[in-house]
A protein has these predicted regions:
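C-terminal helix-rich "cap/oligomerization" subdomain common to oxidoreductases
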Residues: 2-3, 7-29, 101-103, 327-358
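Predominantly a Rossmann-like dinucleotide-binding segment in NAD(P)-dependent oxidoreductases
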Residues: 39, 151, 158-242
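Hydrophobic residues in well-ordered beta-strands that form the structural core
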Residues: 37, 86, 127, 152-154, ...
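N-terminal Rossmann-like dinucleotide-binding module
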Residues: 11-78
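Contiguous beta-strand/loop segments that form the cofactor/metal-binding neighborhood of enzyme cores
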Residues: 216-293, 319-333, 350
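Conserved SAM-binding strand-loop segment of SAM-dependent methyltransferases
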Residues: 82-88
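C-terminal active-site/capping subdomain that shapes the small-molecule cofactor and substrate pocket
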Residues: 287-358
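Beta-strand-loop-alpha-helix segment that lines the small-molecule cofactor/substrate pocket
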Residues: 101-108, 112-159, 174
């Protein structure tokens, strides 16, 4: 029985409502959560309009090394010039009452520094993934936020996206029977001179940037943590783009229930992000699973067939993400993707490199 668009919307809304559920004693205040956006690159270009579109968030400060760009964006979002900071005077943000939280949208190598500095300034932190360069940095970020009594959320936007949530619900409800295996991949053909090929800035190759989506998806789809990881890493034909970081990574993960996940990521080819889950009673697949729009869920189990294209458009993922974190700040709740979630992925990435002998 195919699910109607109305059924899809209803299920998605219920899933999101469960994500945002709060204790009966919590009452959401009217005040919007003010964000300082740290870094004004590509990813910030999605978050800025999303926060403005959300019901409980707003942009109240900007942090950038490019004053002209910052001034232009500030004018778009009614941010006063006194709330534009650079990386040197960032700590003065502690004295800005309009800033409740920061969104860290910087290269990976800067995540730990600005998360810790923001925490010391008394601001809650929404940090882009990957959380950090390594396990040690992730642990320091968590410790700093706990010491300052501020919240830390890692921006795993797929945790708040309706199609991903629907896939999780179908699995949890047993629609596919016992899950046996998962396949997932995500990659793109990267141009030359990208900061992502600089190991000091990126931490490593595609596993840090796009492969982490497959890694994290296998964890939230199964609801389990992998107990065994095996990986291979390669660079094809001595490609000059990949002197410092690897081009390709493939790995398998075995989970306690016996589920085996097979994943691949690359910077050397366009590999549309997807995951496919095989169960004893059926299967499901989400194409474009990790991009900003065009997510397509297909599934077959029993007499049921699903073929649903999510009509939502960018920046809907970022709206849901911002609203969730702001809701948690307003109501003193633990985010669904806290620092500990990011730490686990950093631990598994370390295992991937170790088993690949890198």
């Amino acid at each position: 029985m195919p699910l109607s668009r109305r059924d899809f919307a209803k299920l998605s809304a219920l899933s999101l409502a469960a994500r945002f559920a709060s204790p009966l004693s919590a009452q959401a205040p009217n005040k919007k959560i003010g964000y300082a956006v740290i870094g004004l690159g590509r990813i910030a270009g999605h978050f800025l309009p999303a926060a403005a579109m959300s019901t409980n968030s707003e942009i109240t400060a900007l942090v950038s090394g490019h004053p002209d760009k910052a001034a232009r964006i500030a004018a778009q979002y009614n941010v006063p010039s006194t709330s534009i900071y650079n990386y040197e005077n960032f700590d003065q943000i502690a004295h800005n009452p309009a800033v409740d939280a920061v969104y860290v949208a910087l290269p990976n190598s800067m995540h730990a520094e600005y998360t810790i500095r923001a925490a010391k300034a008394g601001k809650h932190v929404l940090c882009e993934k990957p959380m950090s360069l390594n396990v040690s940095e992730a642990e320091q970020m968590i410790a700093a936020c706990k010491a300052a009594n501020v919240k830390l959320m890692i921006a795993y936007r797929c945790h708040y996206e309706p199609t991903n949530l629907k896939a999780v619900k179908l699995i949890r409800d047993g629609a596919l029977g016992q899950v046996q295996a998962i396949e997932s991949a995500f990659g793109f053909n990267m141009g030359p001179n990208e900061w992502r090929t600089n190991k000091k800035l990126a931490g490593g190759g595609p596993i840090y940037d796009v492969g982490i989506y497959s890694l994290n998806a296998c964890r939230y789809l199964t609801g389990e943590e992998p107990e065994h990881i095996q990986a291979n890493i390669s660079t094809i034909d001595h490609d000059p783009r990949f002197v410092e970081v690897e081009e390709n990574t493939s790995w398998t993960m075995k989970f306690p229930s016996g589920i085996v996940a097979s994943c691949s990521t690359t910077y050397g080819a366009n590999m549309p992000g997807y995951f496919r889950v095989y169960g004893s009673k059926g299967w499901l697949q989400v194409d474009n699973a990790f991009v900003y729009e065009g997510l397509h869920l297909r599934a077959e189990f029993g007499d049921t067939k699903i073929d649903e294209l999510n009509p939502a458009r960018d920046p809907s993922h970022f709206v849901a993400e911002a609203e969730h974190f702001s809701h948690c700040v307003q109501n003193n709740l633990q985010p669904q993707s806290p620092g500990e979630e990011g730490l686990k992925d950093m631990q598994y990435i370390a295992q991937i490199y170790k088993t690949a002998s890198v």
